[in-house]
Swiss-Prot record:
Belongs to the eIF-1A family. This is Translation initiation factor 1A 1. SUPFAM superfamilies: Nucleic acid-binding proteins (SSF50249). The keyword Cell membrane does not apply. Gene3D superfamilies: Nucleic acid-binding proteins. Signal peptide: none annotated. The lineage of its organism: Archaea, Methanobacteriati, Methanobacteriota, Stenosarchaea group, Halobacteria. It comes from Haloquadratum walsbyi (strain DSM 16790 / HBSQ001). NCBIfam families: eIF-1A, PRK04012.1-1, PRK04012.1-2, PRK04012.1-3, PRK04012.1-5. Residues 8-82 form the S1-like domain. One of its GO terms (molecular function) is translation initiation factor activity.
Amino acid sequence: MSDDENRGSHDLRMPDDDEVFAVVTNMLGANRVTVRCADGNERTARIPGRMQKRIWIREDDVVLVEPWDWQDEKGDITWRYEKSEADQLREEGRIR
């Protein structure tokens, strides 16, 4: 057994070229949240319909956000990490 298997870590979804890590800071309602992104920007992110009522997003959740091309202060949430996955990302130094 390797060290990775002993710790229980597994492959995590990493951001694509147009995605950034973010932490949810505020729930705005109407399927919108405020997120603090790893690139230093604070954005209003939209929870897409495919995630509504299937994947519940709360404050302090770690998510992936795809900023809009035409309006950089807004974006779409594309992925939510479980608590254990977020802890693993913090241990690896990918997020704070």
